């Protein structure tokens, strides 16, 4: 049975879904004001592995991942500009155009990294009615109060506040660096609806005046709407957002539900550069697109799953080169097996030893998704297979058996091993979109997609008869 580490209980627990055979999973997605970096990539690959292993285990997953397109302020302490509006002013375009642009960019990254698309990808700007209704319920239950057009959640009304992050309210108040907002009854109270100044671009009418939602209320309202207005199985996200974001989500949602928001809190750890967290604020980040110019998407994915999702990953050229070498080892192994499997049947008997590796693979994955150990099992299988190949002791039937086993477990790893010269499906999709743009004479869009291909390390050439060719640079 799968055991998952639950950040809420701080222990590994047996995973049992609320509804037999089905899993509800909500993952906090990126704030879309720039291209995703490898820290984002690490997290969403980790959640993809979780989803894939649940599906491998026979469960149907209802996967929600939002895109935050309003309400995430530059400072988490509810001061400063909205991150998307700030970028919109720099680029002198509408903030929703900014959001659209970077959602499209994120989708390209996720396709390249072979991350399965979520079943639903809600955006707060399209859920304003549901968010307002959620805030109204909080007010009706006396968990929130309105002051001069803004609405605040009353932390003292929720005695369990701090249970996810392990913080208590007294320490939070004494350690607060935030100037006290006179509108708040308690310094820890946080905004669920924010009064919009005249210059604010994204704003909506509400029972409390013109404003916009706070960052934290968005996830509570959208998960409530899309996961049955009840407790759901798994909430995923980055460990750095445990406080205040996830903590505030719990307070809001459990105030309405009167029971747990989610049974499991599965949080991934950060990526570091020279021991320092990779982040946009420190300008020490590498975008997924820049990394893809140097490395095959499967190399990046293998680099991620070579570490446990709860451990810190150090980003370096050395680490990526090691992943590249390991992918080459896997690729050569698969290629050799395919060559043998394609041969005519021989007289050698089939040796079925994959069940041993299958058991060990599942034991590793059942232990809180221990992908490093699961990969080590595969590397051992590669070594054993190569020994048998070298000694001419591997039959065609055995090769086919091993290939079949690899295909099953690679549905969990999600490593796309391209044949030499083969263009990934995600790159082909962009090529088709560019062709459609050219056919409709949308040349600015065509040029934009050509530039995107270049960013991803591919060149496109227009040929006769309205065809095209894509090549790796």
Give the ranges of each region predicted by the language model.
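Short phosphate-binding/catalytic loops that engage adenosine nucleotides
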Residues: 59, 143, 458
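The substrate-binding groove and active-site-proximal loops of carbohydrate-active enzymes
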Residues: 88-94, 119-125, 209, 238
């Amino acid at each position: 049975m799968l055991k998952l580490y639950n950040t809420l209980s701080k222990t590994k627990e047996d995973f049992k879904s609320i509804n037999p055979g089905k899993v509800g999973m909500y993952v906090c997605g990126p704030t879309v004001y720039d291209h995703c970096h490898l820290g984002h990539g690490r997290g969403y690959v980790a959640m993809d592995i979780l989803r894939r292993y649940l599906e491998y285990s026979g469960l149907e997953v209802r996967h929600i991942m939002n895109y935050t397109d309003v309400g995430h302020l530059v400072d988490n302490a509810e001061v400063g500009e909205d991150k998307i509006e700030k970028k919109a002013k720099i680029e002198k375009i509408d903030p929703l155009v900014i959001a659209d642009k970077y959602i499209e960019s994120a989708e390209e990254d996720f396709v390249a990294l072979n991350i399965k698309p979520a079943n639903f990808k809600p955006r707060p700007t399209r859920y304003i009615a549901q968010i307002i209704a959620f805030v109204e319920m909080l007010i009706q239950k006396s968990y929130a109060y309105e002051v001069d057009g803004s609405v605040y959640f009353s932390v003292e009304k929720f005695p369990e506040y701090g249970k996810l992050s392990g913080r208590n309210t007294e320490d939070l108040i004494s350690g607060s660096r935030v100037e006290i907002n006179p509108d708040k009854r308690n310094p820890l109270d946080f905004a669920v609806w924010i009064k919009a100044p005249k210059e604010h671009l994204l704003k909506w009418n509400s029972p409390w005046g013109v404003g916009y939602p706070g960052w934290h209320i968005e996830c509570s309202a959208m998960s409530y709407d899309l996961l049955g207005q009840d407790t759901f199985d798994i909430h995923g996200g980055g460990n750095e957002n445990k406080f205040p974001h996830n903590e505030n989500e719990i307070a809001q949602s459990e105030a309405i539900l009167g029971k747990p928001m989610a049974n499991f809190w599965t949080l991934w750890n950060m990526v570091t550069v020279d021991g320092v967290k990779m982040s946009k604020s420190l300008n020490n980040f590498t975008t997924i697109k820049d990394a893809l110019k140097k490395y095959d998407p499967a190399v990046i994915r293998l680099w991620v799953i070579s570490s446990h999702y709860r451990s810190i990953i150090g980003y370096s050229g050395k680490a990526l080169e090691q992943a590249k070498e390991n992918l080459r080892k896997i690729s050569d192994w698969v290629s050799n097996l395919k060559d043998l499997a394609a041969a005519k049947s021989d007289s050698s008997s089939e040796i079925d030893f994959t069940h041993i590796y299958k058991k060990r693979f599942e034991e590793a994955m059942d232990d809180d998704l221990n992908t490093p150990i699961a990969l080590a099992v595969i590397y051992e299988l590669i070594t054993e297979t190569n020994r048998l190949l070298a000694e001419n002791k591997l039959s065609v039937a055995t090769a086919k058996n091993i290939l079949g086993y690899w295909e099953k477990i690679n549905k969990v790893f999600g490593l796309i091993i391209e044949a030499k010269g083969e263009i990934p499906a995600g790159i082909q999709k962009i090529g088709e979109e560019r062709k459609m743009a050219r056919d409709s004479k949308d040349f600015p869009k065509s040029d934009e997609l050509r530039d995107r291909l270049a960013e991803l390390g591919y060149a496109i050439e227009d040929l006769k008869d309205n065809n095209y060719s894509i090549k790796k640079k």
